[in-house]
Each structure stands twice: as structure tokens, then as C-alpha cells.
Swiss-Prot record:
Cellular compartment(s): Cytoplasm
Region (Disordered), start-end ranges: 1-117
Biased composition (Low complexity): 53-65
Natural source organism: Mus musculus (Mouse)
Protein name: Growth arrest-specific protein 7
Pfam families listed in its UniProt record: FCH, WW, WW_FCH_linker
Entry's Gene Ontology molecular function annotations: actin filament binding
Length: 421
């Protein structure tokens, strides 16, 4: 998250740079930049310079081209005069520290230039991977959404990029679609159950082998009756599947797409605002560079005595350069505020999407568990429908059946004898 603008404090000269207390002209004060370079500020005119000012009013002890308006310090790093880039296109912009900015003058010949501290990609500023320490994850052990979707990703379908947040939204919408398709799958399962129950009930009314008699006939009648009982079990199973599995899956988060659309627009608006702020920063940086070049040109004119009005022009150029620096400071501040707001909303929203995904998965898991439970119950009920059949089949007695049939259909028990002559 961005921090507020920081104004460096006055510090004594570091060892090795100035061996004794520096006597500065009235109104001038000495400061250290975050990179350890000393610069000087005139608190009366807001003029800044890298070179120690002399006692002569308006002119520093060293060549004037090194004097400039000092850009703002944000998050501990100075913005530099890098070329502007249109915010609507994907691009990468390196931010160098003040020590690298040619517009702000060079340091002593033996001083090394500082490396880039930040890198800007699609208007979002990140720490430069070569110079900044590794950041601590917000939720290190959880593979959380809030840690892994800050950058944009190249769109495999085209030449553009897809925001990390957009990928999360796509996953949410895909999850909603999967939930809908699961509901449709259960509906097809219900249709199969209903059709199966209908066919079982119809078959149970079939008259085939209805004339079977005896204990086997009773067992056969029970077989047909068990089909009717099983049909009832499957009808109840299909009804419970509809009310306890299919319907909840279909109706879960009915307005989810609308909610996600609002969420998408909210984050997209913040991102657009960030891009607009970034464009303002680049415009202000370009303006500062132009003012500094103008100041340098007028200073060179003074050195070669081209005009009697050059010294007055230099003062005007310095005021304009200072104003340009102030404008850049204000634009960077507004940019950091916009990025901070986007950052906060990203963290809050991605954590909410994470919670919604956990909730969706858990809801589906519970209803699929309900499906398997109903399936187990159906199996038990089906088993109960065949138990009477098993009992009657164990009682089938061919001898008893023969007795009953003979008693009912006998034609006589007197056997024939031989004929007499």
C-alpha cells in the first residue's frame, strides 16, 4: 500500500563528504536523499539543487545546470523524468532513483548510479525484482487469491492482457456454470429414475405366468408385486433427488452473475482511475523535464553573457521548474492514493471471492453426499422389496404343490384292472 508523501529531515553531513559544519547562505538548508546523496533546499524560494550554493544570490558554487526542482519522495523513492507512455496500452516502465536522473544532475565521478527501484507494468507499480527484497505474502501458507493475482497475464486468445482479478472472476463464473451443469446432470438422473419406475410399475401389471399355481405361484406373484414396490421406491428417490439435490444446486446464488458483474465494474473503475492518475504522472514528469531543460539552457546563456535579462529569466525558469516539481509531487501523491485504494479493494474482494469459492465447493459436496445417502437408502428399500420374495421362494415345496393340485383336479383314484374272459 502506498504511504503518504515523506519530506526528508535535516541531517548533519555524513563522514567523508564534509569534514566540518557547512556554512550555507541565508535560507538554504542541507538534506540527504533516500539514496544517501546530499541536496540543498532554499526554504524561501523552494529552490532545490544538488550542488552546495555559494554566497552569491541566485547562483550556486558549481555549474548551474545541476540545479533543479527535486521531485517528490514516495514510498522512499524519488520519481524520475522517464518518457511518458500512453496508459491505455500495455507497457513496462522502469523507475530510477534520483541518483540516476540526468535531469537532476550527476553525482561525483566516482559515485555509482543507483539501480532501478520500481517497475511499472500496465500503470501498476511493483518493486523491481533485481533491487528490492522479496515481499512477504499476506497469507503465506494458504495459496490465497490475495497473494497471486496482482499482475496482468497475456491473453492466449489475443495480443492483449487479462487482469489477474479478471481471471478470478472467470473462475467464479465457471464455478457457477459447473454448478448449473451438475444440476442438469441430476435432472437427467431423475428422468431415468422416473422412466425406470414407470416401466417397473407397468411390468408389474403384466399377466405373463399369472396361472402359475401353488407355492411357486405365490412366489411368482410376489416377484411381480416387488416390481411395483420397487417402482414406488424409485419414484420417491427421484422426488427426493429433485427437492434435496437438483433444486438446491440450481437455485444456489440465483443473482450470482449480477453480483459478479457489479464486482467486476467496481474493480475495473478503480483500475481505470489508476491508469488516469498514471497518465497524469507521466505528463507532469514530462513537463518537469521540459522546465529543467529550459532552466539549463537559460543558465548556459548566463554563463556566456548572451543577454542582460538572462538572470531574471533564470529566476522565472526556476519558479516554473519548482512549480512543475510540485505538480509532479501532487500527481504522484494522487496516483499512490488511487493505487492504495485499488490495492485495498483487491485484497478485500479477492478474499471475498475466495470465501465464495470455498462456500460453493462445500455446498456442492454436501449435496452430492446427500445424493449418495439417498442412493444408499434406495438400495436398502429395494432390498426390502425382494425379502418377501426370498421368504416365499424358500417355502416352495413341489410335493405340497402336487398334493394341492391333485386334490383340486383329481379324476379318480380307482386304478384300472385286467379284463376278465
Amino acid at each position: 500500500m502506498a504511504t503518504a508523501l515523506q519530506k526528508p529531515g535535516m541531517v548533519p553531513p555524513p563522514p567523508g563528504e564534509e569534514s566540518q559544519t557547512v556554512i550555507l547562505p541565508p535560507g538554504w538548508h542541507s538534506y540527504l536523499s533516500p539514496q544517501g546523496r546530499r541536496y540543498y533546499v532554499n526554504t524561501t524560494t523552494n529552490e532545490t539543487t544538488w550542488e552546495r550554493p555559494s554566497s552569491s544570490p541566485g547562483i550556486s558554487a558549481s555549474p548551474a545546470p545541476h540545479r533543479s526542482s527535486l521531485p517528490t519522495t514516495v514510498n522512499g523513492y524519488h520519481a524520475s523524468g522517464t518518457p511518458a507512455h500512453p496508459p491505455e496500452t500495455a507497457h513496462m516502465s522502469l523507475r530510477k532513483s534520483t541518483g540516476d536522473s540526468q535531469n537532476l544532475g550527476s553525482s561525483s565521478p566516482g559515485r555509482k548510479q543507483s539501480k532501478e527501484n520500481t517497475i511499472t507494468i500496465n500503470c501498476v507499480t511493483f518493486p523491481h525484482p533485481d533491487t528490492m527484497p522479496e515481499q512477504q505474502l499476506l497469507k503465506p501458507t494458504e495459496w490465497s487469491y490475495c497473494d497471486y493475482f496482482w499482475a496482468d497475464k497475456k491473453d492466449p486468445q489475443g495480443n492483449g492482457t487479462v487482469a489477474g482479478f479478471e481471471l478470478l472472476l472467470q473462475k467464479q463464473l465457471k464455478g457457477k456454470q459447473m454448478q448449473k451443469e451438475m444440476s442438469e446432470f441430476i435432472r437427467e438422473r431423475i428422468k431415468i429414475e422416473e422412466e425406470y419406475a414407470k416401466n417397473l410399475a407397468k411390468l408389474s401389471q403384466n399377466s405373463l405366468a399369472a396361472q402359475e399355481e401353488g407355492s411357486l405361484g405365490e412366489a411368482w406373484a410376489q416377484v411381480k408385486k416387488s416390481l411395483a414396490d420397487e417402482a414406488e421406491v424409485h419414484l420417491k428417490f427421484s422426488a427426493k433427488l429433485h427437492s434435496e439435490v437438483e433444486k438446491p444446486l440450481m437455485n444456489f446464488r440465483e443473482n450470482f452473475k449480477k453480483d459478479m458483474k457489479k464486482c467486476d465494474h467496481h474493480i475495473a473503475d478503480l483500475r481505470k482511475q489508476l491508469a488516469s492518475r498514471y497518465a497524469s504522472v507521466e505528463k507532469a514528469r514530462k513537463a518537469l523535464t521540459e522546465r529543467q531543460k529550459d532552466l539549463e539552457m537559460k543558465t548556459q546563456q548566463l554563463e556566456i553573457k548572451l543577454s542582460n535579462k538572462t538572470e531574471e529569466d533564470i529566476k522565472k525558469a526556476r519558479r516554473k521548474s519548482t512549480q512543475a516539481g510540485d505538480d509532479l509531487m501532487r500527481c504522484v501523491d494522487l496516483y499512490n492514493q488511487a493505487q492504495s485504494k485499488w490495492f485495498e479493494e483487491m485484497v478485500t474482494t479477492t478474499l471475498e471471492l475466495e470465501r465464495l469459492e470455498v462456500e460453493r465447493v462445500e455446498m456442492i459436496r454436501q449435496h452430492l453426499c446427500q445424493y449418495t445417502q439417498l442412493r444408499h437408502e434406495t438400495d436398502m428399500f429395494n432390498q426390502s422389496t425382494v425379502e418377501p420374495v426370498d421368504q416365499l421362494l424358500r417355502k416352495v415345496d413341489p410335493a405340497k404343490d402336487r398334493e394341492l393340485w391333485v386334490r383340486e383336479h383329481k379324476t379318480g383314484n380307482i386304478r384300472p384292472v385286467d379284463m376278465e374272459i
